[in-house]
Amino acid sequence: KGYRNAVKQFIEASTPIGLFVDSDLPPKDKYLWFDKLINNENPEKTIVIPEGRKDSVFFMIQEMEAWFLKQPFCLDKWAQKEGYTKKETTNIAEHSILKNKNIEEISKPSEKLKIIMKRFFVKNKKAAKYGKLKTAPELLDALNVTALISLDDELRRFYLFVNKPVPR
């Protein structure tokens, strides 16, 4: 389990570092992630993050696809760059999957993104398909990171941690 090794390195680091992990939990339950470090069958394998270090653990509340859903304009930028045309004039943000929804609460954002891309974009009579390795890098480039930080509480917390002044 890669995250367990990352946690061990985080704990053993001599300088203050942050740890950004997938929580796969709703925002209100993010601290339940620490329970994954408890090993009831082999208690000696339990990992304990000291209380003073827990504030330096940051959670990816959702899959990164939630970021794209938070900023649907990045889909338009991607489509234009990749030669896709928009099938309908409806604003993507008005689609029932997104309208009036807290993106951090949407279940399986990668699946929702696939639906949105297939519904809205076409090239050579073929609907757009989302693939994490093929499509995500271009979509990441199209994000407005500054605006995204204000839409994602954990990302903002991480940004402030990374950009805090270093004591001299």
Predicted regions and their residues:
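C-terminal accessory helical subdomains adjacent to catalytic cores in phosphodiester-
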Residues: 3-18, 23-168
